[in-house]
Design a protein with these regions (language model features):
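Short S/T/G/P-rich N-terminal loop/turn motif that feeds into the first structured element of a domain
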Residues: 25-74, 100-105, 127-192, 205, ...
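Bacterial N-terminal signal peptides that target proteins for export
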Residues: 1-11
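Short amphipathic alpha-helices in soluble, non-transmembrane regions
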Residues: 107-115, 226-232
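Short, glycine- and small/hydrophobic-rich beta-strand elements in well-ordered beta-sheets
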Residues: 70-92, 118-133, 188-213, 227, ...
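Bacterial N-terminal signal peptides
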Residues: 10-20
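Short, charge-rich binding segments
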Residues: 86-87, 104, 117-119, 152-154
């Protein structure tokens, strides 16, 4: 191998080992992930065909630039990533962003699309929602509240699923007590899966074409399948005017791993 080739390989390796930093303080990250009033965005992308025609070193340089940008924004945002390629025909990868202001997410995504890597991204889905305090849980029986607070037994989960939902007009016309009873039945059906399927809800009315974005993580897709079948059998499900379309399925992966995969 000549000196020029060795130097080029050294540069490529050095660029690839740049790591992406997450929020500097764990407490800030925890608050963004758990507090109400936080905006969540799911941005799904495909790589365009021109990306794969680039020489390897050009892809490495482009990926390195994207990593540095993500590091710059990681002090104010929580940025999580998922590999969809091979499991979903909607996108190659997805980013979930939590921010106190949706404009901060917009600034990050706009900056990302302006990088050499971002110019090869084709956005396939943008889903926006807001975290809120539980509307129905305070009215549940004490035993159900206690069960909902049980910690998950499986901390590491490999798969993520995003399902947007739109309710019909009849749902919003129901009085609070009727909706409470329906959601209690919904929750009772979901309780057996609490320890194997992690869930997070985002409210999207007015922010998107949906009313809710449901986010799931699990190690066992068969348990997730059983959960959905159980929820399809409760009365509340009949008020779902739209369930999915798109449904995004992927694996939870560090963004460094995803970017390096696309740099090869």
């Amino acid at each position: 191998m000549n000196l020029w080739a060795m130097g080029r390989m050294t540069l490529m390796v050095a660029l690839l080992v740049v790591t992406t930093a997450w929020p500097a303080r764990a407490t800030d990250r925890d608050k963004l992930l758990t507090d109400p009033g936080v905006y969540g965005t799911f941005a799904a992308f495909q790589m365009d065909h021109d990306w794969w025609d680039l020489p390897g070193d050009a892809r490495v340089i482009a990926v390195s630039e994207a990593k540095k940008l993500i590091e710059q924004f990681s002090s104010q945002l929580v940025i999580e990533s998922y590999l969809l390629r091979g499991l979903s025909d909607h996108a190659d990868f997805m980013i979930r962003v939590h921010a106190h202001a949706l404009s901060d997410t917009q600034q990050f995504l706009t900056s990302l699309l302006g990088t050499r890597f971002g110019r090869h991204l084709v956005a396939t889905s943008y889903l926006h929602g807001l975290t809120k305090k539980a509307a129905y849980v305070p009215g549940f029986p004490d035993q159900m509240k206690k069960e909902l607070q049980s910690p998950s037994e499986v901390p590491a989960k490999s798969y993520a699923i995003v399902i947007p939902i739109r309710k019909d007009a009849d749902w919003w016309a129901l009085d609070q007590d009727t909706r409470l009873a329906l959601m209690q039945e919904h929750t009772q059906a979901a309780l057996p899966y609490l320890n194997v399927v992690k869930r997070k809800l985002y409210h999207s009315s007015g922010l998107d074409d949906f009313d809710f974005i449901t986010y799931f993580e699990t190690e066992k897709l068969e348990e997730f399948h059983s959960l959905i079948r159980a929820l399809e059998q409760v009365k509340e499900y009949r008020h779902n005017r739209r369930f999915g379309h798109p449904t995004l399925l992927g694996t939870v992966r560090p963004l460094d791993d995803i970017l390096e995969l696309f740099a090869r």
